[in-house]
Amino acid sequence: ALLHHVPDIINVPRAGIVHRLDKDTTGLMVVAKTIQAQTQLVTQLQSRSVSRIYECIVIGVVTAGGKINAPIGRHGQQRQRMAVMEGGKQAVSHYRVLERFRSHTHVRVKLETGRTHQIRVHMAHINYPLVGDPAYGGRFRIPPAASVTMVESLKNFPRQALHARFLELDHPTTGKRMSWESPLPDDFVWLLSLLKQDREAFIG
């Protein structure tokens, strides 16, 4: 798709991609059109001057925000997965609560580092795995006496409930600070609306 819109990036390593999103994660990502821009943007990522903020829906009621500083490496047996482990690469995430529901929480996460599956691994590590993410413990949880629609929506949510919401960086040529925000996708908004309806029906 990138090559269709910007054919010249075939000459840039990794088709200009500066950082990746996990499969099925929606939202913003950085792509450079030249090698020079890619090099500069990678440097910004490594120096942690790029601001990347995500939103997710997790299983469980998160009591407060916080910081997760837990190293991440490749899982010893299941090589497609990552895990918190001694000897892994440093990984730091900052999270805060946006909204609480009966059995779930809408959370915002700011990345300080950018390890593979970082948010998914870190939130599971503190026992709040993402909705729709069975690879990291996100088996669906049903609020007591929830509606059939609520149950089916949680059970069949087709992906991890994770969205790259906000991105801020310095333009690689001009140095101007730039930012972008991506609206939440329809499936995410729909699930939030169901969770709100469920909370209001039982708590008011």
Task: For each feature predicted by the language model, list its residue ranges.
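Conserved hydrophobic positions within beta-strands
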Residues: 58, 94-97, 130
